[in-house]
Amino acid sequence: MILMAKAALRTKLDNYGPQHRNMPVGVARGICPGRVVWVRDPKAAQWSGNLNSTVDHWWMDRNTDQARVDAMMSATLQKLTGARTDEEAWKRIFTYYNQLARGMKARGYHDDEVVAVEINLNNSAAAGIGNYVNESPQVTLAMVRQLVLHAHVPASKVVVYDARRIIYPALLTKIWGEFKDVRFVQNQESQTVQPVHPGYGNYHGLEPADWVEGVTYSANNYNEAKLIPRQIKAATYLVNLALLKAHSYPYSSEEGGDEGQTAISMTGKNHFGSIKGTPELHAAINTDNDGTPHAYSPIVDLAASPNQGAKTILYMLDALYCGRRHQSYPLHFPNPPLNNRVEPYANTDWPSSLLASYDGVSLDSVGIDVLYSQSQNNFDKNQHPRILIRENADDYLQEEATPDNAPSGTKYMENGKPTPSLGVFEHWDSDATRQYSRNKDPKHGQGIELIYIAM
């Protein structure tokens, strides 16, 4: 009875709905400002959905097609940048970032610079991950291939990490099998159940986070939340490779664990995997605590930090398999343009998508619209919605878009100066047409442009 009452109370609060459609706020970023590219190949993700199998998992190559994922990644990068080749796409990515963030004209990548790839391994374990949603080995490898083979970053200068979790075996072997010098950073020393490096016969390239002070906050007194890995502080660039995933769901007996603390886990919250003291920030994002409507969000400070989010050259959402909660099995998305079957669960229809942008605010804005659209008219046999979006879901995006005039009234500061707009926030016109202001008016639109590519 207590659990039912708690779920009922939580559901009353899960009343999020997009407001003020096609009314962008903030300043769009990117070569093509505010552009978000969404690429889908339904044949890339083909897992059977057999949750009870111990030998058939979504992350296996027989279920997730590496060649198709690579093609999706290439199409995403080229459409995002307007380039005709992957090499040209990366040249434009680095040149744009170095001009915008470092004031360097016509400056591309130099081979002494480290590129960190920030991933979401919230459900990772040293011995394996079962079928909980984590960053996929296939998308991670596709990104590493792009960096090494097309951006010409030496493998030894690529650092893949989630400093709050341990790296699961399939991810290590997938990357090291092709790029032996790629480094990984995790939350602890290597564990004996983790695979040794096939090229070195030991744990070469698997490092624990070396915590150093690197982040400041515009409100509240935090201690360990100021600490980030030395390895990431030393990096020149960051790729924010997050998941398209909600964070809270009250009807979760099947999956176990608590209901969650906030609405979504995309590129904004992905930075929680970079700081030691994430528990210190939980109250600020928990809508049952300090995360009230239009409250201060530490996500803004993490996104603006010169040692963290301000290093970002590319934002991407792995949406091959999406989740409804921080601890979640893959979820079918039944509504357009995905049109997955939801019953029986054991079927091969999945979101099977990648989304990317130069503008993290724009990307998460699109992500929220996608998640919300999939929550509509989507009920299980108990008449529970299969996915819910918790209240205040887009508040942090409004704060990021206008930190100099934030709805919370917070004075966001970095290095003693007001934090400028971190991107543009907007909701699409409707779930049916999915049009943003730059789609409707390419010449005068000031918000997001969404490009959908079906492969």
Model-derived features: positions:
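N-terminal export leaders
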Residues: 1-3
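Extended, low-polarity segments enriched in aliphatic/aromatic residues
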Residues: 5-111, 122-130, 134-455
